[in-house]
Regions:
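Periplasmic alpha-helical coiled-coil/stalk elements that build and connect Gram-negative outer-membrane
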Residues: 2-8, 143-255, 356-359, 363, ...
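Bacterial Sec-pathway N-terminal export signals of envelope proteins
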Residues: 33-82, 114-115, 230-269, 318, ...
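Short flexible linkers and secondary-structure junctions
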Residues: 36-156, 160, 164, 174-175, ...
Length: 467
């Protein structure tokens, strides 16, 4: 079975002669609007560029990027300066009274350079780098969810537009049928029961049309939430190309490349490095401290002094009240948790992959079945109408045949929608539902550019991407 279908949706009302003039006009306007309507790739591009959930996830990644320069800062010196000035009065009692007015002034600058921090700096840097990698995968997951929601919203609107047009057409057909039945009742060809049956079906059709209008309004609102604008009349979407050919291939790719799985892997690596970072607090710490100072004791007496020093400091932890040991144990438990979560995400990715694949296979089988059902229902309706003309069929038989055709057409539209959504679900399951793989006409967000701009930054308050 070839599942790499790229055929567009297609649904037609072959018996257009049965539609009212108003329905024909509505369908004509709908078809004309698709010439410049928003396509599915355009809608996905708009969501990629403007969706607030995705933009917030990018900002979150940029904030996590800052963990790396924060850890790298522990390789660098810290510099502090200080100054003081004041007033001091001294009185000395003796044979000769004397007083002195002193105005002390001091200034100093201190530089502290870490030499060894028990391996915490290296471990902390590696932890932060793995946290960045994990957050990038989380961003990929958010991007996939946003694009999948956008594709789903698009196809829901398309389906509901199509169903509404079918219901409008059916309402027009039943209105004509009721009018014809009343005319025949006037001349005694049919009974009052036939008229009542036609009236009942028309009332039901009106109710169905109103319900489909409500469904379309809800779908349009969901479209606006995800994509950022209300849709016009949407052209038929297509099943995405380049899908894996077999279910086993989908599962194999998903358990390796699904972003939720890869994010869990990097999170576990970060947790391992955190164990080493916390353990480093049990090791000695060595730093080099340099100091320059100037002191002026008095404005009356020349007592200026300058000093300079360079000191190596060693701090050896002996006992920290058990706090560090507890935090090491905590870090080990977190690492164990993250390792278990990798398996959890792999199982979840496999389940999602199988479900998406089965949904795709089912939708494609249903399309073939419903296409056959529509063709058969059209033939049956035409035959019932001809038989009614010679008295072999009743008005109820015609109404039933028309309803069967409508049901088949609505089911076909629903299956076509399900096929497209399932195709995008398969792409999402294998981690390929992104702007690059789907070829969206957008500037792809560069995660490396923001990271490089801050990784080795020693100072500066400007933040990339902030508004």
């Amino acid at each position: 079975m070839n599942l790499k279908s790229d055929r567009p949706f297609a649904w037609t009302l072959r018996n257009l002669g049965t539609l009212t003039a108003a329905s024909l006009i509505a369908l004509h306007v709908s078809a004309a609007a698709t010439a410049d309507a928003q396509t599915l790739p355009e809608a996905l591009s708009q969501a990629y560029e403007s969706n607030p959930t995705l933009r917030a996830a990018r900002a979150q990644l940029r904030s996590v990027n800052e963990n790396v320069p924060q850890e790298l800062s522990n390789w660098r010196p810290s510099v502090t300066a200080g100054s003081s000035i004041g007033k001091r009065r001294t009185e000395v009692d003796g044979t000769v009274d004397s007083t002195g007015n002193l105005t002390p002034f001091t200034a100093s600058i201190d530089v502290t350079q870490p030499i060894y921090r028990g391996g915490r700096t290296l471990a902390g840097t590696e932890r932060a780098e793995n946290e960045v990698r994990a957050q990038r995968e989380s961003l990929r997951s958010v991007e996939q969810n946003v694009l999948l929601n956008a594709a789903t919203s698009y196809t829901n609107v398309w389906r509901d537009q199509a169903v509404l047009q079918l219901n409008i057409g059916n309402e027009g057909v039943l209105a004509q049928q009721l009018e014809a039945t009343r005319d025949r009742f006037e001349v005694g060809e049919v009974t009052r029961t036939d008229v009542a049956q036609a009236e009942t079906r028309l009332a039901t059709a009106i109710s169905d049309r109103i319900a489909s209008e409500g469904n379309l309004a809800s779908s349009r609102a969901a479209f606006q939430e995800v994509i950022g604008s209300f849709p016009g009349t949407l052209p038929s979407p297509s099943v995405p190309g380049n899908l894996p050919a077999l279910q086993d291939e989908v599962v194999s790719i998903a358990i390796k490349d699904n972003p939720d799985v890869t994010s869990a892997v990097f999170s576990e690596l970060a947790a391992q490095k955190n164990i080493r970072q916390v353990t480093g607090e049990l090791y000695p710490e060595v730093s080099l401290v340099g100091s320059l100072s100037h002191q002026d004791e008095s404005s009356n007496v020349d007592t200026n002094s300058d000093s300079a020093s360079l000191i190596a400091q060693v701090s050896i932890p002996i006992y920290q009240q058990g706090s560090v040991s507890s935090r090491v144990r905590e870090a080990k438990q977190i690492s164990s948790q993250r390792r278990i979560q990798i398996e959890e995400q792999r199982r979840r990715a496999e389940q999602i992959a199988v479900s998406a694949w089965e949904a795709l296979v089912t939708a494609q089988a249903q399309i073939r079945s419903f296409e056959s059902a529509v063709a058969s229902a059209e033939i049956a309706l035409e035959g019932v109408r001809q038989e009614n003309e010679v008295g072999a069929r009743t008005i109820l038989d015609i109404l039933d045949a028309e309803q069967e055709l409508l049901n088949a057409q609505v089911s076909l539209v629903g299956a076509q929608r399900d096929e497209v959504v399932a195709g995008y679900q398969v792409l999402s399951a294998v981690g390929r539902l992104n702007a690059s793989f789907t070829g969206l006409p957008v500037e792809v967000y560069d995660v490396e550019a923001d990271y490089r701009s801050v990784r080795n930054k020693w100072f500066g308050l400007s933040a990339p991407g902030t508004e």
